[in-house]
């Protein structure tokens, strides 16, 4: 099966490569010759394409842009490259390294007349005749080919002026001969208008959704450009495409790019703008939009925020919305078979759209524009930083790996935040009163990796703005002891994120959940925070009681929402603190307002089962009452690993004390080992409290000595001239001794016995400590039919076990 798929993939890729290797597709390189009308190829390539020196060629760039130039040979140019200067590159909307196509264009006629206008900011302050100084010397005896819409740069006098070709006769391209009439009357063209067309979005400006973009191209470009294909095969081309996904992933951007690249007429309908208070006007607005598009075919109608104008009819109370939905349905059915009109729509709430719109023949294709993965994020970052001045230490790959759950809009915000931070650093060198900024300051501006790190600390994914998602600042060093638990946790969360290939190799899906149980104050919450930080996953902390609300059905909706958010921001750790408050055993909650708690548990169970294996969402529960939790949650496949976090032993207590005091100045003679020995039965929280109290006593003493010294200085100023040492430079033994007088255990022996019992019963009910396969049976993977009573059975069946299933 796999080999068939592989060979199919290979055939496809070789076909694509062959297509890419067409001889007339060349890579753009920097020109040596600065002439605006000349491109250079190597002599072998010119021979291959049957071109001669001085031939006119048509170049095709991006966004359906074309240019006509004269071709010359250049010995220094390699065969697969074409040399062109910046003016030609801008006209073709390409950069160095992009691919363009070239073809002979022998039938370019001499122009009768052309109309060119300068760009306003390049002619400011120029007096004199533009034609005499600039245009006449530029075109004289040059026989330059030009195309309508081209911008060209002319150097003359002391300045360089940019001109735009507004009109040519014959259109769209011609050669400017000696008898061509050149008009240059009229208002100069505004730079802003020009910039807008330059900044049109193309496929290059979209990152992170290659697969979806390929799908959309196929569904939009083929019907618009080659409708005959569908006619030949005898099917109807797709009519409508629905783009859905979280906000900020680039749905509107994709629609604009498709329109620019296909050159189709683009009609934008912003959902809410269609609405009108007059009866019947909203529907007529829709009808007008479709009529306009049919007139200007090929056309793309793009409806943004579709859910605003086409909600489910049974759920809306307004008559207007229902009529608009019906009107949209009839319009989409009424589109003529080959009207070359495609309707695209975008929404981030696909489930609130009327189902009649989502059938075949209307919005028959739905494309999920999801949250990008690490490679997608890197593409997006490269697009947003291509015009930014980056320092050498900026590692965009690292930034991409650390921005889990960020969509394109978040990454754009991140880049601008990093740039602002770079400017902030130089603010003291910038005088806001001055009109101009010193050139040295401008040149020294560059965005460094530190600026990106700062921006990262300030930003979190927009999908998770409501549920505060923090990647906690807790590391493994903050947690003393619990080495086995740490390793277990790393295997659970870090392996699936960092080594997904291993799980594929062994053919198993990673486990999804863990339950920590144990006495209070042993670091259950701290562990969950540390694991989220260590593998750079997003972290959503859910306090159990917050989920429950007074409204019927609201609590379950809260659970659904949280799981949806976690899936969007994957990899994500969902941490349920105090799980026993929302997952009590069902049936025992009498009088809790219609069994709300039971329904919440049911919702959590179904959500845990519905976690798709591709999304790295991990659930960690923490409780100190494991005995009252519903057993269905504890089965394998949900919270399948139950980890007992006991009170720390002596070695762990030393580690906890060291972790707590690692940033504090402690006197050399404070024996932490002895302190750990004396605090048997203390939890991590109790030990932290001892450290805090000792620290507080040291601070108190320090403040008192400063006050005393201040008084002495006031009474006897001359005696206090000499600078004294800090009277309390560190936390001393007596501080710890004083703190130990107030120390108390928060967990009684009785409580510990309960936990130990629960852990033991779990171990017995789950583990087969003495299980071994029988040595004689080396056969197949499954047990043989007749081995019921042989040696195989006696390995793990003990004599005193009652066989409840016999």
From Swiss-Prot:
Phosphorylated by tyrosine kinases in response to T-cell antigen receptor activation. Phosphorylated in mitotic cells. ISGylated. Changing residue 155 to H: In FTDALS6 and IBMPFD1; properly assembles into a hexameric structure; cultured cells expressing the mutant protein show a marked general increase in the level of ubiquitin-conjugated proteins and impaired protein degradation through the endoplasmic reticulum-associated degradation (ERAD) pathway; shows strongly reduced affinity for ADP and increased affinity for ATP; shows normal ATPase activity according to PubMed:16321991 while according to PubMed:25878907 and PubMed:25125609 shows increased ATPase activity; no defect in ubiquitin-dependent protein degradation by the proteasome; impaired autophagic function; defective maturation of ubiquitin-containing autophagosomes; decreased interaction with CAV1 and UBXN6; decreased endosome to lysosome transport via multivesicular body sorting pathway of CAV1; decreases the arsenite-induced stress granules (SGs) clearance process. This is Transitional endoplasmic reticulum ATPase. ATP 2 binds at residues 521-526. Residues 777-793 have a biased composition (Gly residues). One of its GO terms (molecular function) is BAT3 complex binding. Gene3D superfamilies: 1.10.8.60, 2.40.40.20, 3.10.330.10, 6.10.20.150, P-loop containing nucleotide triphosphate hydrolases. The modification Phosphoserine is found at residues 3, 7, 13, 37, 462, 702, 770, 775, 787. One of its GO terms (cellular component) is Derlin-1 retrotranslocation complex. The gene is VCP.
């Amino acid at each position: 099966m796999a080999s068939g798929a592989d060979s199919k993939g290979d055939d496809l890729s070789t076909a694509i490569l062959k297509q890419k290797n067409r001889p007339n597709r060349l890579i753009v390189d920097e020109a040596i010759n600065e002439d605006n009308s000349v491109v250079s190829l190597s002599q072998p390539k010119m021979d291959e394409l049957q071109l001669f020196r001085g031939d006119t060629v048509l170049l095709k760039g991006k966004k359906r842009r074309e240019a006509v130039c004269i071709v010359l040979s250049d010995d220094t140019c390699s065969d697969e490259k074409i040399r062109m200067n910046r003016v030609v590159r801008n006209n073709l909307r390409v950069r160095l390294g992009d691919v363009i196509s070239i073809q002979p264009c022998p039938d370019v006629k001499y122009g009768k007349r052309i109309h060119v206008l300068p760009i306003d900011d390049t002619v400011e302050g120029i007096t004199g005749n533009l034609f005499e100084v600039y245009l006449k010397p530029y075109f004289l005896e040059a026989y330059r080919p030009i195309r309508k819409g081209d911008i060209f740069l002319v150097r003359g006098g002391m300045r360089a002026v940019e001109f735009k070709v507004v009109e040519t006769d014959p259109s769209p391209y011609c050669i400017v001969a000696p008898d061509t009439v050149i008009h240059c009357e009229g208002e100069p063209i505004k730079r802003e208008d020009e910039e807008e067309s330059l900044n049109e979005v193309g496929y290059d400006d979209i990152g992170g959704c290659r697969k979806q973009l390929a799908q959309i191209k196929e569904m939009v470009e083929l019907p618009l450009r080659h409708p005959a294909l569908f006619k030949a095969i005898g099917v109807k081309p797709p009519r409508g495409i629905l783009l859905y996904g979280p906000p900020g992933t680039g749905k509107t951007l994709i629609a604009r790019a498709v329109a620019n690249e296909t050159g189709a007429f683009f009609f934008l309908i912003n959902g809410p703008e269609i609405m009108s208070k007059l009866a019947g006007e909203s529907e007529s607005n829709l009808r007008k939009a479709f009529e306009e598009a049919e007139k200007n075919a090929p056309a793309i109608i793009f409806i943004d925020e579709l859910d605003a104008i086409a909600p489910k009819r049974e759920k809306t109370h307004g008559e207007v919305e229902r009529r608009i939905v019906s009107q949209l349905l009839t319009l989409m059915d009424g589109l003529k078979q080959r009207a070359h009109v495609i309707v695209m729509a975008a929404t981030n709430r696909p489930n609130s759209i009327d189902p009649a719109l989502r059938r075949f023949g209307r919005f028959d294709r739905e494309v999920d524009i999801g949250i990008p993965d690490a490679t997608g994020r890197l593409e997006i970052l490269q697009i947003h930083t291509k015009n930014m001045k980056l320092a050498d230490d900026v590692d965009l790959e690292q930034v991409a790996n650390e921005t889990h759950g960020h969509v394109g809009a978040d990454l754009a915000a991140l880049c601008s935040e990093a740039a602002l931070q770079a400017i902030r650093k130089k603010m003291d060198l910038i005088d806001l009163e001055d009109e101009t900024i010193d050139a040295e300051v401008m040149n020294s501006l560059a965005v460094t990796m530190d600026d990106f790190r700062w921006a990262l600390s300030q930003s979190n994914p927009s999908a998770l703005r409501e549920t505060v998602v923090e990647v906690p600042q807790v590391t493994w060093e903050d947690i003393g002891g619990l080495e086995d638990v740490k390793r277990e946790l790393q295997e659970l969360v870090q392996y699936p994120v960092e080594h997904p290939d291993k799980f594929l190799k062994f053919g198993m899906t990673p486990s999804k959940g863990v339950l920590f149980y144990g006495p209070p104050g042993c670091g259950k919450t701290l562990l969950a925070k540390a694991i989220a930080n260590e593998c750079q996953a997003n972290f959503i902390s859910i306090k159990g009681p917050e989920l429950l609300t007074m409204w019927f059905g609201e609590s379950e909706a809260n659970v659904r929402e949280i799981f949806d958010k976690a899936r969007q921001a994957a990899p994500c750790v969902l941490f349920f603190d105090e799980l026993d408050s929302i997952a009590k055993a069902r049936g025992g909650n009498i009088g809790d307002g219609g069994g709300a708690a039971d329904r919440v548990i049911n919702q959590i169970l179904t959500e845990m089962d519905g976690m798709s294996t591709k999304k790295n969402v991990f659930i960690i529960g923490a409780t100190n009452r494991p005995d009252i939790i519903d057993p269905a949650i504890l089965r394998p496949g949900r919270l399948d690993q139950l980890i007992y976090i006991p009170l720390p032993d002596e070695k762990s207590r030393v580690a906890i004390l060291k972790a707590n005091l690692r940033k504090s100045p402690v006197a050399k003679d404070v024996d932490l080992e002895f302190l750990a020995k004396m605090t048997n039965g203390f939890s991590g929280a109790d030990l932290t409290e001892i450290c805090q109290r000792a620290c507080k006593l040291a601070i108190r003493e320090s403040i008192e000595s400063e006050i005393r010294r201040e008084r002495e200085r006031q009474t006897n100023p001359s005696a206090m001239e000499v600078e004294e040492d800090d009277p309390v430079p560190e936390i001393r033994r007596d501080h710890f001794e004083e703190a130990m007088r107030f120390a108390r255990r928060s967990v009684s022996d009785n409580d510990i016995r309960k936990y130990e019992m629960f852990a033991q019963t779990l171990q017995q009910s789950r583990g087969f400590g003495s299980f071994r396969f029988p040595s004689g049976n080396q056969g197949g993977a499954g047990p043989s039919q007749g081995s019921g009573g042989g040696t195989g059975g006696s390995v793990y069946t003990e004599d005193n076990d009652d066989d409840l299933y016999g």
